[in-house]
């Protein structure tokens, strides 16, 4: 029987135990620190040991919580110095706190063991908080990682089910998916019907119906019926495997802002450390007040720790990507999220993106005493032997039972229509050209689409309009994009000028370009890119079918309805797991909210640190204020970064 990977479970459990151990250690150190601090403040140590015995007693007692809380920081700092990598937060904390304890050697100044122990304690509290914050922000992506099934059920000759690792299932194998189980591999349903929960992949809370003959993708939960599924892909190429690979690799693609912060920290930390040394040595040499200037230098060191930036900025991007995943929006890296925030031009492919990509009857105009239903029935009977999509849409619109015995002598005139004898009457269903051959002038119709005219015994019975229907949320999406500051919305299509103009007008698009071949779309996007000014970016949205060249060329390629589409997942920078255009505007809002949070944290952290550095140099800031400048600012920045995960109201 297949089971989940025990190594992953063991690693996860070990990490959790390590975090709990650190938390308990810090709580013990905090308790001891509180007791010692109270004894020191209330004069108990002075009463017990006198002067200067109270100072040495205080030194020893504060050293206990200091070592309990910070031994791992001191150990890491020592190891890094041995490796030649001194300038990190562990080194800064070690030097600053040991220096605070060493101030006891200067009899002309107040002892600072309490500050030294407090700096280490609160630094560790901040580190613990950061660990919890990162863990929380990973939950949405961890939930996404849980879509990977542990096994697949394969029916044996004796009728029993054997649980097999999905990797071991060959293409074409029929697997059994019980109610409540995840679909392990992409395939087609050969027996059964059910409701599918696709929330983990698409963010869609409404279950989707599925029946025999329907395609089914891995990662969905079978909610009701027992399914027999014939696999169409190996597990490694299934939707769930591709999505997991995408999510796991997202952290490798860094945003420009993220890379800047990393480079900045490499310069900032040694620069401030050097400034601290110059401040302490220079001030001491000039004034002779060594204890005062060394204390200022130590305060500099505490504030110089860059953790508020190096933690909160990546955490903001991580939270934004995780929050987007809740909506079924997979962003391949923080660099694409950053670019998405600057998008001011959105280019759409029409079919399958703004429209449903399927023909359907949008209007029925009967004449000569026919009703809508009777006109549809005559047309559906005439088209009953055709497999053309237009014929199928007419039969679907009729919805009633069709008796093929009523039809005789059916002929198909390619590019024009069909002629058939129905109940002894000669019926012609076709376009305006076929009508002209019969000597009848086609009436005008204001509705744009493919028009089927119906003649019964040379009498005009009416016409049926068939079109690719616009998606229900497409019009609102365009309004939302304009409201979000997108300056230009453009539609590219291979359809006629008339159809394109109708769709563009209905949706409120800024411009459209019709009768384009796939290669023409790339050229059109190139021209739009050349017209971009400033930092504005261009996003192209397609359904993943034949859109790879344009998706790749755009600043941001967005593939819609990508469930099961390997080409789309490969070519796009952002993958929308369902076919709702509304998620495009939501993805842009997530990106802009994330970038706003990133810059809030950068400005806040640098502003506070710069202020405290100036105050420390002037001798106004003490070690306690430095603790706020480091740990306090880091915690506030992290709390702000966690807001990036909140996407419910976007």
Predicted regions and their residues:
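Residue-level signature of catalytic and energy-coupling elements of molecular machines
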Residues: 77, 112, 133, 152, ...
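Actuator/coupling domain of P-type ATPases
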Residues: 2-16, 62-151, 170-175, 182, ...
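Conserved catalytic phosphorylation-site environment of P-type ATPases
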Residues: 89-94, 201, 260, 295, ...
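P-type ATPase nucleotide-binding
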Residues: 178, 365-488, 497, 509-525
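Juxtamembrane helix-loop transition segments at the membrane interface in multi-pass membrane proteins
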Residues: 78-88, 129-143, 315-334, 642-650
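Bilayer-spanning, highly hydrophobic alpha-helical transmembrane segments
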Residues: 30-31, 259-290, 296-314, 599-628
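Flexible metal-binding regulatory segments at protein termini and peripheral loops
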Residues: 1-54, 64, 161-163, 241, ...
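Conserved ATP-binding TGD loop and adjacent catalytic N/P-domain core of P-type ATPases
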Residues: 424, 456-600, 608
